[in-house]
Amino acid sequence: ALNRSSGQWIQTKNNNSKLLVDKRNIEILGVIGDVTQWTPINKTRLWVYHLHYFDYVSGDIQSNDSATIKSIIDHWIEKNKMGKRPGWEPYPLSLRVVNWIKFALNGQSISGDVLDSLSLQAWYLSRNLEYHLYANHLFRNAMAFCFAGLFWDTKYSEKWLRKGTSIITKEL
């Protein structure tokens, strides 16, 4: 179940958001590429990671087509099965979970498949935390847990929120 009693979400503008050029192309780090090619061989690893972050869905999307964004999210779910890299690496997964939740909280309806994927990604993250990297990676893992923990109202979400706040408290 979704947690709808946690207060009002204040929409934020992501000044670093990527530019969705059209229904298939996105500009990331000054380079345009096909948004449906999740592991392009002609792009840098950093570019590919940014593609999987989904930063462009969490900011001001008034100029973007939300139906296109939803289609891209659905395509990601279809093409990136659990554990498939680079999308399921903990750092890009953490950023994506937060961005998809922000997308939903910014007034966009999301499908049951997207909710299922978000839950699965949070569960997967709980088994693949980046303790070995610490710093920004572990912090982003913790933030994803906090967002997931507050977004849902389940026994798992309570654990995610506790885990996220515990990591943040310990690391700060």
Language model features with spans:
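Short glycine/proline-rich turn/loop motifs
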Residues: 36-38, 78-79
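Extreme N-terminal leader/anchor segments
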Residues: 1-36
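Aromatic-lined, polymer-binding surfaces characteristic
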Residues: 44-172
